[in-house]
Amino acid sequence: MDYEFKKNTLDGTYHANFSMGHEAMGRWLVEDVAKDTELLAELYKQIAAVKNTQDEWKLSGKVMTLVLTDQEVIVQENALFENSEEEFEEDIHIYDDECISVCGLEDFETMLQSWEAFIRRF
């Protein structure tokens, strides 16, 4: 999972560009986490709690839902969770890479640390 963080110096907005297949992770960072250091602290706490357990932790944000397990992290648009029981029509296609991302727990923790270091600099 490759990523790059940028800040627009004109309007102060943050951008998180992720490699193909992980675009939803960038949306989640920018739209649901942003500069919320209290949320980052809670995420680190929950990562430690799920390591080496069968536990799962879920956080529903404004736009995305995050699911932590001992092996992986899933970030998915809230609308997909709401419609997960429904079948979509065959002619309707969702560009999944923008709606859902999956990565390993350790990669996720490293990415969060990078994001936190980035937002603290600006």
Swiss-Prot record:
Signal peptide, first to last residue: none
Provenance organism: Aliivibrio salmonicida (strain LFI1238) (Vibrio salmonicida (strain LFI1238))
Protein's name according to its UniProt entry: UPF0231 protein VSAL_I2591
Pfam families: UPF0231
Superkingdom of this protein's organism: Bacteria
Similarity comment: Belongs to the UPF0231 family.
